[in-house]
A protein has these predicted regions:
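Intrinsically disordered, low-complexity, mixed-charge
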Residues: 1-90
Length: 90
């Protein structure tokens, strides 16, 4: 299992990035969470097989249709609880 903490910047709020992330992650069977941050970024944690986490990280680099991703910062982290949730904004 692999777990990664992600911070995505660019035009990623107000474009359904959180909802898209939740759907993509759940569809891949990943555990973790996603939330908007007050600085305009989106933060997430993904945990699952190396293959599925890598595919999710690649997908995050483009995001949903209306998003414009500028940068993604990915760092290893501790595994989250089971399931995938959309957390309230920070």
């Amino acid at each position: 299992m692999k777990s990664v903490h992600v911070v995505i910047s660019g035009r990623v709020q107000g474009v359904w990035y959180r909802a898209w992330t939740e759907g993509e992650a759940a569809g891949r069977g990943l555990n973790g969470w996603v939330r908007n941050r007050s600085d305009g970024t989106v933060e997430a944690v993904f945990s699952g097989t190396e293959t599925e986490v890598a595919a999710m990280l690649d997908a995050c680099k483009t995001g949903p249709r209306l998003a414009s991703v500028k940068e993604g910062v990915f760092e290893p982290c501790d595994p989250p609880p089971q399931g995938f949730t959309k957390r309230p904004s920070e």
